[in-house]
Amino acid sequence: MVSISKSLVADICVGSSPPTVRFVTLLENHDISNTTFPSLSGVLAQYGSSLQGPAGLQHVGLAQDQKYQHALTKGLKAVEKLQHFLDGPAPMSGDPVVLRCSSARSSTLLEITDETITSGPPCAGAAREREGITSFHRMKFHLPKHVGCVQDVHETSSQMLHLSCDGLRSEDTLFDRFGRWSRDHVTIVSGMCLFSDKIMRDAVQGDGKLDVSKLSSQEPTLYELEIIARSSSAIADVASHILGKNGAAKPIPLEIVLDAPSWHYFQVVHGNLASGHCTPAEALDWLQAVELRCEQVTTVFENSVRHEMGLRGVPAGFYHILAAPGTAGVGTSIRQALTSGMVPDIADCMDAICEVEGERWAMFYSLIPEKDRPCDFRSLGNLFYIYEVVRPALAAKNGSTAAELEVSGPNSALDDSSSSGHSDILDSALHLKANVERPLIMSIDDRAERKIYSKAQAFIKKIRRAPQIPSHPLLLELYSARRVFINGNTGGDSLYWNDSSPHPLRMNTTAGSPELEAFGVIRNLYGNDCAQNLQRWFSEAGVNVSGHT
């Protein structure tokens, strides 16, 4: 099991030559009764339920004290809702059937500890300013000793998580006192990027020519390794917790969707192709290198999730893992155009989506105002990230045609401005629907991707109010605490935009100081087993790891 019980984080100094890395412990000294002071700008690590006055915030400025306190209180209330939602209510009678169901559902329990990391933008204009101030609370998952046929199971695992969900009410639970599920199926969605920003930029030369070798021979980047290690553990904890509640009731269907971009990156080279700086054949080679990396990374991601699920005693047959199921049509359309020596057209891609995705896409597209519909590959790629999140909520049951859905348009009952957040209106809309599906969607991702899920949340609200869509979904946004910071977090930058891979890091700038490659950083953060497994899985997927031992 990937262990993140120790709050060890890496701080990479990219401004030094060569880049260096240090490891900072945030929440490990339990002798401290209230607050610790990590040397990371805008980051407050603490024990206890409240901040201990302005003295504890000297590293972010006294003016931030009230904002941090508010974020901590709001975050705690949110995870308390999550705890109640996942663990459910106590039995209300002495009926043996009720007690038996309750006992089965109590096989996994969720505990909120008093360890918290509250982080915010270190200064005005910082990269993370749009994320606001966020509190991550350590949640301990108490797992059953025996699940299915596997007996050697770790009993506890913990995650530093933040929950965002306007639609989750304090009284909501995943199942009632009689063991009946309140949701029809569960989908856990998680995503990641490919390579790093630097590598993607280096693959396009200054004159617009493409250098495919920068992609095809690339070793795993620290970003890719870290996001897989962090996300896999969180996915497995949440999924095994839910599946552990099956008990005597009918098991709830659970899918895990792993969304890594492929054709989404075509927007990087589309302009070069259209202006004649590269040929369709060169663009095709470039795209195929990206698609191969997507396939390889997704395979490793899936292996990591399955490994973590196995450590928690969950048999493979209890869940399904899908790789971005809604994206196939676009990639095929782009490749066909390039193979024919043509510049791909977004209209052809839209036709391909309609053909492959059918009513799901028609329902989704009907919710988009005309002015917000995609007009180029960049906007289409951004839209598809959102579509993959809400896709599980778009299963049609009432036989509505695409034309009927389009007529309704994104207005009237779908307008967020007048009724956002009013559960009575949502419930009224639900009452008008027939054969309603009640899917639960849980996203698990880095906080830097919040924009995607915030927009997906807006679509979820529209779906719940749309009488023509037979679905009443709930989206819970879970974010895991960052484990790698850049330059002491002085700019709030993320690893993807500052990853120096494949170049190794050094422990200090002294000549001859020890080098630490990407797998070494993972070994320090997540343990030797995690690093070895990732190295083996990447090698089996065909990614070069020859430079690592």
Swiss-Prot record:
Top-level taxon: Eukaryota
Coiled coil: none
Catalytic activity annotation: L-prolyl-tRNA(Pro) + L-arginyl-tRNA(Arg) = cyclo(L-arginyl-L-prolyl) + tRNA(Pro) + tRNA(Arg) + 2 H(+)
Positions occupied by motif Conserved DDXXE motif: 445-449
GO terms, molecular function: ligase activity
Keyword set, alphabetical order: Ligase
Known EC number: 6.3.2.-
Pathway of action: Secondary metabolite biosynthesis
Cited function: Arginine-containing cyclodipeptide synthase; part of the cluster that mediates the biosynthesis of a highly modified cyclo-arginine-proline dipeptide (cRP). Within the pathway, amaA acts as the scaffold-generating enzyme and is responsible for formation of the cyclo-Arg-Pro diketopiperazine (cRW) from L-arginyl-tRNA(Arg) + L-prolyl-tRNA(Pro). Additional enzymes from the cluster then further modify the cyclo-Arg-Pro diketopiperazine (cRW) scaffold.
Domain notes: The conserved DDXXE motif is essential for catalytic activity.
Family affiliation: Belongs to the arginine-containing cyclodipeptide synthase family.
Name under which the protein is recorded: Arginine-containing cyclodipeptide synthase amaA
